[in-house]
Amino acid sequence: AISPYIYGMAGEVEDTGATTRRWGGNRSTRYNWQANATNAGKDWYFENAKGDDYRKFLADNRARHLTSAITIPIIGWVAKDSTSFGFPISVYGPQHGKDPYRGDAGDGQRPDGSLIKPNAPTQTSVEASPDFMKQWVTAIAQQEQKDGARSVQQYILDNEPALWNTNHRDIHPDPLTYDELLDRTIRYASAIRAADPQGLIAGPAEWGWTAYFYSAKDTATSVTLRPDRRAHGDTPILPWYLAKLKEHDQSTGSKLLDILDVHFYPQGQGVYSPNSDAETAALRLRSTRALWDPSYKDESWINDNVQLIPRLKAWVAKNYPGLAVSLGEYSFGAEQHISGGLAEAEALGRFGTEGLDYAYYWFVPPKNSPVYWAFRAFRNFDGKNAHFLDRSVDTHMDGDVSLFASRDESGKHLVLVALNLNPTSAAKASIVLNGCATIASHEKYSYDAHSTSLVDDGLKSGGTLDETLAPYSINVFDIVLK
């Protein structure tokens, strides 16, 4: 079966047909649920600011029948108010950059670019113990019980901890180690589990490729020397993390992780950007193969066979069988270009065929952008919530066409998504059904570089399905069988 939770987003879902929403990002690392205050770290001058109210986030999701994934800080400090900032120029002197709207808030770098050593975390923050987070999760669970409807499906253990010493260096200047990650995971996950035994716990929400294999301490030294990893049997950090949590589960009877959660962004030159030149667009589409294809060597500094989803599932199977796998953040860039839409459609299709459990697009595709229509192709292709179905069907396609097929429980209703990944040539698609079924009716919806929406080609009766797929196009076939 295809998981319904691979169609997630972080922001407002509108009519995209998204099924689940994530509360995350750098600001979530320092969110104080009592003060409704947060701090985006180096993203914005290490300034505290008013947060988005988590209660509204959850209430909105409940009203829309969406599940929620909410990030719980485990860094140990959260914003104490909505006004303080980490590197006042009045205290530290002139800095490389400053907030144009709050002139005393600096960026923590001297004019020559060297880093200023931070003051105590109390400059901006208060301690946030596991018990403080237990109180928050308890408040969430009690509110949902009161409302009589559950929205929170998973609690995510912070956000990209291997980057704390850069993104949040004013409160966590030292690079994260293997042992600190495990210690914080156990202490905070235990508190979450005690407060809401029904909730699923996801972690470690790491940023990308390097952080799957090395700790922040390793990368701060060098991955060649990798002192932290060598001190832990030279085992890559994610498999080590899973194995240690499995050991903890077996020794205590307390399961602290349900979902292996990582983030993934393509690293090829210009891919995760608005760039839409022909070369970058082609690379963007090829880069989606890193999600699944064992033969694809990533065309970036990674220069390795990523095969992300099979790799993560294999690590789980070996080190902590039974866990689900989530991409807590991902995007292939170029939201306003057809190549970005095709890459997103390719990703959504592969999530289904590869058996991914959860995925959350970062952030939300702009209304009527190609990425928006890629979501609509899978989740609301007719504007009336018709969608890709929940059982995957094996397909075979040649050339520059990707074909994803789904069926309902009866087997009499099929929805196909066909992508022509060639920018200049149309493709002939003769769709043949292996077996005894014949087509009663079919309807085609298509979107290409010249479209403003998915265009309905009209209901057609019977016969074969021979169609032309425009260059760089997303095509949905809604088929009823006899």
Tell me what each language-model feature is.
Residues 1-259, 268, 304-482:
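Non-catalytic accessory regions flanking glycosidase/transglycosidase catalytic cores in CAZymes
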Residues 218-231, 275-295:
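Short, flexible helix-coil linker/hinge segments at the edges of structured domains or between repeats
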Residues 256-270, 275-284:
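Long, well-ordered, tryptophan-enriched scaffold segments
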Residues 288-312:
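Alpha/beta-hydrolase fold catalytic core
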